[in-house]
Amino acid sequence: MRYTHIRLLPFLAAALLVPNLGKAEIAVKNGEKIAFLGDSITAGGWGSPSGYVRLVIAGLEANGIKAEPVPAGISGHKSDQMLARLDKDVLSKKPQWMTLSCGVNDVWHGPRGVPLDDAMAKTGTYDDKVSTRGTYKKNITAIIDQAQAAGVKPVMLTATVIQENLDSKENGLIAPYNAFLRELAKDKKIPLADLNAMFQERIKAENKPNVKVLTSDGVHMNVEGNKLMAIGVLQALGLNTAELDKAKASWPPLEAAGIMAAQKAAEAKAKAAAEKKAKEAAGKGK
């Protein structure tokens, strides 16, 4: 298997590592299982009708490949928790493939996060339980090693963004985590979907500082963010431009359903808030 780098941002030296077998072809075969290991971004990627997991599966099907998803995203999870449940949630399901989306919470959770390495763990930034969480480098390497030992082919996803202000402190902190993922993917010779580079490129191109371009809250995906994630994963799985166009042509019904679901959720949230406020007001009047 040889790998081709698709350059996204020359000034970032960012790339997608795409599997290629001499003749370009989609790596996933009909009937294969794909596990999607991750946090709330991945949980939403399956839970939402327009989530990236569903778009990936629909995109493959549009190209004649019926793949079976194994959803394995849990809200709030970090690298140590994903490692702890790897066998139960992924390996026991015997998938042929596994995408790994991990890193946002390791950084975003601050003192409760997971340090990149042993040196970072000793900076005094973390709480007194940090030693029980290990380090990001060790946890991610163990996940990849265990998956490969079980015959599962991993696809690495760089962590997206923490706030769409690319100069935020959190985005600065997550950069070395993503640099490690790129290097590990290269060393292990596994496909890399450099989603962080794709997100940075898109946010800069849009140039709308006060508008959420790809996320609903700076972290979790909106419809456009899910689409961009799906494109990155499908590219890493070997889809060419024509195949990606086929995939994207299958998405509008899912996008519409996702928008409707988001609207209903927002309405329900607003209604619940109004009812709570009214109840509190009634209580004060007694």
Residues covered by each model-derived region:
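A structural signal for the hydrophobic beta-strands that form the central parallel beta-sheet
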Residues: 36-37, 71, 156, 215
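Short beta->alpha junction loops
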Residues: 71-78
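Catalytic nucleophile-elbow at a beta strand-turn-alpha helix junction centered on a G-D-S/GDSL motif
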Residues: 32-47, 78, 107
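Alpha-helical cap/lid subdomain in secreted, periplasmic
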Residues: 28-30, 50, 54-66, 80-285
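Boundary at the C-terminal end of the N-terminal hydrophobic targeting segment
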Residues: 22-24
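Bacterial N-terminal signal peptides that target proteins for export
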Residues: 1-10
